[in-house]
Amino acid sequence: MKFVSLLTFLLIPGCCLAITCDELQSPTQVRVFLERSKDSNPILRRNVSTTLEISPCEKEACNSKNRKEQQKEVLHLLRLDDNSRVHFLKGSRSSQCLIQRGERLLGCAACSELANEACRSYPDSSITRLQGTNIDSRDFSLLESESNTYSCDELEKNPGFFKLEIGISGAEYDQVIAFFDETREIPVTLNFFTDGILRKVYRTFPKYYLQIDKQWISTVLRVRSTRGNEKAFVAETLVYIQRDGNKYNLYLDPKNDPRLKNMSPSNLFITN
């Protein structure tokens, strides 16, 4: 009976397993892990359909008591492989959408759950950044450059977490210090430095991690652009996965999203 229990433990994918620095000894191992860890971020997953609340602000406006309601936008995000669609449902850009098809980014002035109209191309430089925020997918691409250097350290005072230091050359940032949850493979913080000065922090919160089909997802993300200290920030974006009661509007298989029940997800990347 003990043998059967042990065999079951070993065969169930992701059952109680944790990644440690022992499995991150080579640059290839680290890059594979970093690519896999992006699945914990609903904005970066290659396949997802979700409704998000995004609240960006700058400087003094971030401290306003009514900041969340004043700045909040609600959007539906659909990602299929290299294509993505951001449909703004509430806020200053309501009914607009941004569509990325491979290396091409289009902005559409009139969108619905079924169609995109009045679309035009955006410059290539806009393609990696979620407009109106400080969230940039290029930040995450930098982590996996083949020219990077990596070092991993276990945290004796914080068991269950490890620190990954990444040296970057020829980019806006030259160093990233990241802290990861070993079991969930989620980055708790990603700290981006230039010449030793902290410039940006991506932070998740373990209290708001969610497990779906053995995949852990961060349901809350905070991104701060900084001047040397996370508390001394000049811009901030808060991201929440929206909920209906206790159910998160998050579908790892877009076909299961009730919002898309009348439309094949792939058709939502068609523009007129």
Show which residues each predicted segment covers.
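Sec-dependent signal peptide recognition
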Residues: 1-9
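N-terminal signal peptide c-region/cleavage motif recognized by signal peptidases
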Residues: 13-16
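N-terminal mature ectodomain segment of secretory-pathway/periplasmic proteins
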Residues: 19-113, 148, 154, 239
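Flexible, processing/modification-adjacent segments and terminal tails
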Residues: 19-33, 100-176, 197, 254, ...
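Short, surface-exposed beta-strand/loop "edge" segments at domain boundaries and coil↔beta transitions
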Residues: 58-64, 92-99, 109-120, 171-175, ...
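A short, sequence-level motif marking secondary-structure junctions
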Residues: 77-82, 101-104, 124-130, 182-183, ...
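Extended low-complexity acidic/polar segments
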Residues: 91, 248-252, 264
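Gly/Pro-enriched, hydrophobic low-complexity segments
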Residues: 157-255
